[in-house]
Curated annotation (Swiss-Prot):
Keyword Coiled coil in annotation: no
Annotated signal peptide: none
Subunit comment: Monomer.
Protein family: Belongs to the phosphoglycerate kinase family.
Chain sites annotated for binding substrate: D21, F22, N23, R36, H59, L60, G61, R62, R119, R157
Key words, A-Z: ATP-binding, Cytoplasm, Glycolysis, Kinase, Nucleotide-binding, Transferase
Top-level lineage group: Bacteria
Pathway membership: Carbohydrate degradation; glycolysis; pyruvate from D-glyceraldehyde 3-phosphate: step 2/5
Locations listed in the record: Cytoplasm
Name of this protein: Phosphoglycerate kinase
Lineage: Bacteria, Bacillati, Bacillota, Bacilli, Lactobacillales
Broad enzyme group: transferase
Gene Ontology cellular component list: cytosol
């Protein structure tokens, strides 16, 4: 990566501004998944161990009006982070003003402060989300000219707390998490060890058109699963029963299939049910077609075997999107089968592109078997599409 990283700057005695991604699920004041906090620890620890004074910024959820602030404070995150660091995390509970400035100026080397939810600034004119220049300048003024972006999950957004601060400091550098995310995902797409196989699932073709187009150019094969399977099948004239379909995307699906030159591999059977929720019958289809009155909710056993075969010998695998409704035990065999097929390949670099795939790997006990699990669903999708991420582009060149 041709950008400066946190290792390239002198941190001692400096108030170092750090954008982290602490957008974690909080229920009744309790954090239910702390993965993103844990992922930020190496960068935070590096800064404080090298004598920096870490001033952390993060958003939590969406905040559009005053009422949305309820339950969106970063207070529980500050408490959790303090436990993980085994030291106090100063939390003034505001996003600007004298109280915040005094607390930052009182920091000593090796101390940590967390600014309140940056999206609280969205209540009055979306200042954070629309990258208000004055807000970016103000937040930048709270530090000593160094900004560390370690929030891959928001790198595809141009917000005041990443791009805005970057524009107003001497050096904007990447943290370890951001550096690793780019190294794994971009390297996999731009310079993969081959065979390189991409696996795309999820419900909608519309969400993945750009990704499919880019990966058809880069990968040796692209395997398709999940709900979007049925738009591709219908585009080929195959009966899909009551399965999910995007009628307005059938022509795009046909076009992608025509351009793919055999690289796009579709399921050859499905696990179908006679309703999405209150079903009374679940069975495997004979072939690719789904029976009338049924809908496909997972890839079937023949498809699992086919995908296992296609993955044999793969050296780079990027997976984004589950194969079925994995939250339901009746429809998780496809996702489990594909995960197991990926991780058993000798010497494979296996990457999960965040979002539902990451949740599936964690919930189904396979997370530790992958080379890398991205912390940013949207950002990893845009990297897979070949897009430039604003948060990354704003960093200082080496």
């Amino acid at each position: 990566m041709a950008k400066l990283t946190v290792k390239d700057v002198d941190l001692k005695g400096k108030k170092v501004l750090v954008r982290v991604d602490f957008n974690v699920p909080v229920k009744d004041g309790v954090i239910t998944n702390d993965n993103r906090i844990t992922a930020a620890l190496p960068t935070i620890k590096y800064i404080i161990e090298h004598g920096g004074r870490a001033v952390l910024f993060s958003h939590l959820g969406r905040v559009k009006e005053e009422a949305d602030k309820k339950g969106k404070s970063l207070a529980p995150v500050a408490a959790d982070l303090a436990k993980k660091l085994v030291q106090e995390v100063v939390f003034p509970g505001v996003t600007r003003g004298e109280q915040l400035e005094a607390a930052i100026n009182a920091l000593k080397n090796g101390e940590v402060l967390l600014v309140e939810n940056t999206r609280f600034e969205d209540v009055d004119g979306k200042k954070e989300s629309k990258n208000d220049p004055e807000l970016g300048k103000y937040w930048a003024s709270l530090g000593d000219g160094i900004f560390v972006n370690d929030a891959f999950g928001t790198a595809h957004r141009a917000h005041a707390s990443n791009v805005g601060i970057s524009a107003n400091v001497d050096k904007a550098v990447a943290g370890f998490l951001l550096e690793n995310e780019i190294a794994y995902i971009q390297e996999a797409v731009d310079n993969p060890v081959r065979p390189f196989i991409a696996i795309l699932g999820g419900s909608k073709v519309s969400d993945k058109i750009g990704v499919i187009e880019n990966l058809l150019k880069k990968a040796d094969k692209v395997l398709i699963g999940g709900g979007m399977t049925y738009t591709f099948l219908k585009a080929q004239g195959i009966e899909i029963g009551d399965s999910l379909v995007e009628e307005d995307k059938l022509d795009i699906a046909k076009d992608l299939l025509a351009k793919a030159n055999g690289k796009l591999i579709l399921p050859v059977d499905s696990k179908e049910a006679n309703a999405f929720a209150d079903y009374t019958e679940v069975k495997d289809t004979e072939g690719a077609a789904v029976d009338p009155g049924f809908l496909g909710l997972d890839i079937g056993p023949k498809s699992i075997a086919k995908f296992d075969d296609e993955l044999t010998g793969a050296k780079t695998v990027v997976w984004n999107g589950p194969m079925g409704v994995f939250e339901n035990p009746d429809f998780q065999a496809g996702t489990i089968g594909v995960m197991d097929a990926i991780v058993k390949q000798p010497g494979v670099k296996s990457i999960i592109g965040g979002g539902d795939s990451a949740a599936a790997a964690i919930n189904l006990g396979r997370a530790d078997k992958f080379s890398w699990i991205s912390t940013g669903g949207g950002a990893s999708m845009e990297l897979l599409e070949g897009k430039v991420l604003p948060g990354l582009a704003a960093l200082t060149e080496k």
